[in-house]
Design a protein with these regions (language model features):
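Sec-exported extracytoplasmic/periplasmic mature domains
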Residues: 1, 63-67, 84-88, 107, ...
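Extracytoplasmic ligand-binding site segments that recognize negatively charged/polar headgroups
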Residues: 1-129
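Short beta-strand->loop
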Residues: 2-15, 32, 148-160, 169-172
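Short, hydrophobic alpha-helical packing/hinge segments within bilobed ligand-binding/sensory domains
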Residues: 57-58, 121-124, 140, 178, ...
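Periplasmic-binding protein-like
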Residues: 99-108, 146-170, 216
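A ligand-binding cleft/hinge motif common to bilobed small-molecule-binding domains
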Residues: 132-149
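Mature extracytoplasmic/periplasmic domains
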Residues: 169-230
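Conserved C-terminal helix/tail region of periplasmic/extracytoplasmic solute-binding proteins
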Residues: 226-293
Length: 293
């Protein structure tokens, strides 16, 4: 799927901080160069959520106090990851039993969430339609720059650490040109411009040194190394069987009506029937009166 990189054409790889060299997903750094990185956390309305930031954890996404003001990821891997953390499972579990228990927990959540979202989180959190949502740190930075009442936390119980990397597909014909482009993206000023524009964290140590002190110390973009080492996990590619199991469970979760919706179906149907009956009776009465005259 990917071509091995010729690092003679990528001398700026020297700028990549040691933390992101030889990552778990590419142990020998043969196929990829990190571009940006970040964590998954919780965006929340600081004016409406009365829980101290240090106490906010994933269970808030099941909190009935914020019912119908909670958003949830609209993709299975991120949604299941949150359930996996809550249940004490690995973020890379392939156990059918554990995935099924995660699905049960996600079904329970349906009674309190407003919607499953991805990019819609920007509009809903920005407009105050929702109070809390899981999302990516880089996008949280963008949101908080625009809406000062929003905050972001990375839960103590753990989270996903993700890395966006530059790679070259196996079928690419201009491999050397692609490597030169990767090298260009690793130039300190280019990496600095990238992180400044999109809000995601940079793995480029030279670019990091160019950031202002406030950004360097911002725990949203750059959590403590102790937290990163002890409380984060990088996703691994799951087996085809585990992926299919998760997808099937997710489809079931999304298609299952929650109890709060079900309980209104019969009453609403009866009201509609009664209303329709009354309308029919009134119309017949009016028609009969017209016939008399």
């Amino acid at each position: 799927m990917l071509q091995k990189l010729d690092f003679d054409n990528i001398p700026n790889f020297k700028n990549i901080t040691e933390t992101f060299v030889n990552p778990e997903y590419d142990p020998q750094n043969e196929y990829s160069v990190p571009y940006t990185w970040g964590t998954v956390g919780i965006i929340y309305d600081t004016t409406m959520i009365d829980i101290p930031p240090e106490e906010i954890d994933w269970d808030i996404l099941w909190n009935e106090d914020y019912s119908d003001r909670i958003l949830m990821f609209d993709n299975p891997r991120d949604a299941f990851a949150i359930a996996e953390i809550r249940l004490g499972y690995s973020l890379n579990t392939e156990s059918s039993e554990e995935l099924e228990k995660c699905a049960d927990l996600l079904k329970e959540q349906k009674t309190v969430i407003q919607a499953y979202v991805m990019d819609e989180v920007f509009d809903k959190m920005g407009a105050g339609e929702a109070l809390v949502a899981p999302y990516y740190a880089g996008d949280a930075v963008t949101l908080m720059d625009e809406y000062e009442d929003l905050g972001f936390v990375t839960p103590k119980s753990g989270t996903n650490l993700f890395v966006d990397a530059l790679c070259i597909p196996a079928g690419a014909k201009q491999k050397e040109a692609a490597e030169m482009y990767i090298n260009f993206m690793c130039e300190p000023d280019i990496a600095y411009a990238t992180t400044s524009y999109i809000g995601y964290s940079t793995p480029n140590s030279a670019a990091f040194d160019m950031l202002d002190e406030e950004t360097q110390n911002d725990k949203v973009s750059y959590p403590d190394s102790e937290y990163l080492n002890n409380n984060t996990t990088i996703f691994r590619n799951l087996s085809d069987e585990a992926n299919q199991k998760m997808q099937d469970l997710w489809t079931d979760i999304k298609s299952t009506q929650d109890e709060s919706q079900n309980k209104w179906i019969v009453p609403l149907f009866l009201v509609a029937c009664v209303t329709l009956s009354i309308v029919i009776i009134i119309r017949r009465h009016i028609i009969r009166k017209k016939d008399v005259f």
